[in-house]
């Protein structure tokens, strides 16, 4: 018995030297022994090294673009709006730096009470229709390769009323991410027409404002960050259905609207409105010259109809301006996927060249300005102009060039069709 005890005492872990009695388990193999404590320590070391290697590989292969690179990418697709591009570039860069810091902290389990916690900063965009708000957000998502969803605030209602729940916004993001929850939790959600959900009145009412203040209240939690329960099929929730849990803490929300009438609120606050001999007179030219949205303060937005809690969750404000004629002409011609290049490509498939006179492009821009549709209305104008030609061209093998001049845009004449024989003569005389 004594010999057996001595032999048990002689069995020791080959790594830490502890005897069999000092550990829970001692595993033997090939003349060596290892205890359960050393096995656990080895597992921790291996896991830490694997996580470190994975994080390093991700950083090397998936570097976050710098603000200057983000802005340069936006320049390729979006004309003008330099101030908005700068603000958005910095905001998006800081947001995804924060996301990566949170992921790194979670992976390495280094959450410390002394470590500074970075709060999420969502974005509010102010600007007229057709100025590029939606396109800026779409282009950002394409650059960052993250899921992107667009929601219309006017279709939302408070939970329990006819209309869409705010959770349906998150469902759209999940669908854009092919129901990959981890990927969706790093996405971007663009909520348009948010000015339409302003409070109907500052005065309390006996009727509930389910599509105004009620929607703002419902949006608060998902803007700030919460774990939302999403019905996979959409629609209203009911107790006997499965839900997908989605954490909105790292989802970037870009909330936008035209905010028509906000400029009057800002001007009143700045003291530009008054009565009597001391009142300051302003002309339309003065109003056009000054971008009053740049001077917007939270108190102006509250007076417009947004609740203070909602404004507080949108600390970054970017303003976009109306596009003038020169900017709209650039929108037509300069971006990689400009409308002129797209239609030229369509005509090229029928072996026909499409040409625009400079005056024709200016006339198209003027029409968009007159209609008040901005860049968004350019495609409709181009369609109206080119559909009759695109109808005839496939049946006309003799046409070499379609030339658009100002008179054609104004509807004073048909677009000019140049035949192959005429083109050959022009080239000979040239």
Swiss-Prot record:
SUPFAM superfamilies: Glucocorticoid receptor-like (DNA-binding domain) (SSF57716), P-loop containing nucleoside triphosphate hydrolases (SSF52540). ATP binds at residues 128-135. Keywords: ATP-binding, Chaperone, Metal-binding, Nucleotide-binding, Zinc. The keyword Iron-sulfur does not apply. GO terms for biological process: cell division; proteolysis involved in protein catabolic process. Residues 1-54 form the ClpX-type ZB domain. CDD domains: RecA-like_ClpX (cd19497). InterPro entries: AAA+_ATPase, ATP-dep_Clp_protease_ClpX, ATPase_AAA_core, Clp_ATPase_C, Clp_protease_ATP-bd_su_ClpX, ClpX_bact, P-loop_NTPase, Znf_CppX_C4. The keyword Hydrolase does not apply. Zn(2+) binds at residues 13, 16, 35, 38. Belongs to the ClpX chaperone family. PANTHER family: ATP-DEPENDENT CLP PROTEASE ATP-BINDING SUBUNIT CLPX-LIKE, MITOCHONDRIAL, ATP-DEPENDENT CLP PROTEASE ATP-BINDING SUBUNIT CLPX-LIKE, MITOCHONDRIAL-RELATED. This is ATP-dependent Clp protease ATP-binding subunit ClpX. The lineage of its organism: Bacteria, Bacillati, Actinomycetota, Actinomycetes, Mycobacteriales. The gene is clpX.
């Amino acid at each position: 018995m004594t010999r057996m005890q001595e032999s048990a005492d002689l069995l020791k872990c080959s790594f830490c030297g502890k005897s069999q009695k000092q550990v829970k388990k001692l595993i033997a193999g090939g003349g060596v022994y290892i205890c359960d404590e050393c096995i656990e320590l080895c597992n921790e070391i291996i896991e830490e090294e694997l996580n470190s290697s994975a994080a390093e590989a991700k950083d090397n292969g998936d570097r976050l673009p710098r603000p200057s690179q983000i802005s340069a990418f936006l320049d390729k697709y979006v004309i003008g709006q330099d101030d908005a591009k700068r603000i958005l570039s910095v905001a998006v860069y800081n947001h995804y730096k924060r996301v990566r810091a949170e992921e790194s902290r979670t992976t390495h389990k280094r959450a410390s009470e002394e470590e500074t916690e970075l709060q999420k900063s969502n974005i509010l965009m102010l600007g007229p229709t057709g100025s590029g708000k939606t396109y800026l957000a779409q282009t950002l998502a394409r650059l960052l390769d993250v899921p992107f969803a667009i929601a219309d605030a006017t279709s939302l209602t408070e939970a329990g009323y006819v209309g869409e729940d705010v959770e349906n916004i998150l469902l759209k993001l999940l669908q854009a991410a092919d129901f990959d929850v981890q990927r969706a939790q790093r996405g971007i959600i663009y909520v348009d027409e948010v000015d339409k959900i302003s409070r109907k009145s500052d005065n309390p009412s006996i009727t509930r404002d389910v599509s105004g203040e009620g929607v703002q209240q419902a949006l608060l939690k998902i803007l700030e960050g919460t774990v939302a329960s999403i019905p996979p099929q959409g629609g209203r929730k009911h107790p006997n259905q499965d839900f997908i849990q989605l954490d909105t803490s790292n989802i970037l929300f870009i909330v936008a609207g035209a905010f028509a009438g906000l400029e009057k609120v800002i001007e009143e606050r700045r003291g530009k409105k008054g009565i009597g001999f001391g009142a300051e007179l302003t002309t339309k030219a003065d109003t056009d010259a000054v971008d009053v949205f740049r001077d917007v303060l939270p108190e102006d937005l509250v007076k417009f109809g947004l609740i203070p809690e909602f404004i507080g969750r949108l600390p970054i404000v970017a303003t976009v301006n109306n596009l003038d004629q020169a900017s709209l002409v650039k929108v037509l011609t300069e971006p990689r996927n400009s409308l002129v290049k797209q239609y030229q490509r369509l005509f090229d498939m029928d072996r026909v060249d499409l040409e625009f006179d400079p005056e024709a492009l200016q006339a198209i821009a003027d029409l968009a300005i007159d209609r008040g549709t901005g860049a968004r209305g350019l495609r409709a104008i181009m369609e109206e102009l080119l559909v009759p030609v695109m109808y005839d061209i496939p049946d006309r093998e003799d046409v070499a060039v379609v030339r658009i001049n100002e008179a054609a845009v104004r509807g004073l004449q048909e677009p000019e069709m140049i035949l192959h024989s005429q083109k050959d003569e022009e080239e000979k005389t040239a």
